[in-house]
Structures are given as C-alpha cells and as structure tokens.
Amino acid sequence: AKIDKVSLDVVFAAQTAWQILLAAESCNNLSRFDGVKYGYRTAEYKNIDELYVKSRTEAFSFLTKATIIYGSDVLAKDKYESCYDKSLRIRRIVLTKVKELLVSYDAILTPACSRLTFEPYDTKDAFTKVFDESLYTAVASITGLPAMVTGGVQLIADAFNESTLLSIAHSVEKEEA
C-alpha cells in the first residue's frame, strides 16, 4: 500500500460549517418531537403549549437543547445567508477538495479524535467539547462520503467505495493484532 502525507486545508472550514448545518438540521428534525405524535410525552400538562414545553424539557438533554437553540439562531432571517447558506457553499467546496484528493488515492486516513482517553466533564461543557472533537470527523460528516473509524483512525473514501473502506479497515485491524 502506498501512503502519502497530504494537506487538506479545508478542515477548519468544514468543522464550522458542519456545526452550523448540524444545528440547523437538528432544529428542524427535532421539531416534530412534540409529545403528541412523536417522542416522549410528559405525564402532566394543562394545555397543548405546556405539553410541548414539558415534553421537550424532560426528554432532551442539555446538549440537544443547546443545539436546537443554536440551530434556531443560524436559521433566523438575519443570519440565514451569512450562516446557513454560507455553510452550504462551504460544504460544496469541501466535497470538491476531498474528491480531488480521492482521484489519486483510494482513501484518506485521518485521526478520529484528539486523544485515546477522555476525562469526565460537566454537561455544560459538552457543546464546546463536542465542537472541538468534531474537527476530526467533520470532513466526512459534511461531505456525506463513506467513512468509518477503526483502530483510532478514520478512513474516508469516494462515493460507492465502501468495499475499499472495508478492505483497508481489515488491513488496519490486522496490523494492530
């Protein structure tokens, strides 16, 4: 196997764009979990508004609530173009750059996270911690290309090349054994 060190200068842009797109899409997708048709339903409520608020308050974690609020913010009329729309454009740029690399290589191998072990942290710090660690997986998340983590590394391949990923992952795991 031929392995080269390459540079992917769009990683930091991918991380920020991924965070914005994740929040916006989560905000929209989680809006259906109102306790009426989908999701957890609180036991006690006086009216429909209270059902929505209490069901979501009881069911969603701090991180989920923070993501929904952030998503609402980036989808707001005054920020839509500068945040959400710009992130969609960045997504296309990142995908183009990654596909250019994948013309010459079967896969891209990257770290999956910044460290081997994690210390417990307060849930109030979760949003920042998750954002910091997303640097390593943001490219795969934002491009929609097939990716997998094995042996502490992430492998990213071109569309419809999952068999290549599995073959490389098998080789990585054999090397670890």
Which residues fall in each region the model found?
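Gly/Ser-rich, acidic/histidine-flanked active-site/gating loops
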Residues: A1-C27, R32, V36, S104
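Structural helix-boundary/capping segments
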Residues: K2, R32, K37-G39, A66-T96, ...
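Short, active-site-adjacent cap segments at secondary-structure transitions
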Residues: V11-A13, R115-F118
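Short low-complexity, flexible loop/linker segments enriched in glycine and/or proline
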Residues: A17-A23, D125-A126, L155-I156
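Short, surface-exposed loop/helix-turn segments at secondary-structure junctions
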Residues: W18, A43, N47, E81-K86, ...
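Glycine-rich phosphate/pyrophosphate-binding loop
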Residues: R41-A66
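Small-aliphatic-rich amphipathic alpha-helix that forms the alpha element of a beta-alpha
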Residues: V98, F127-A147
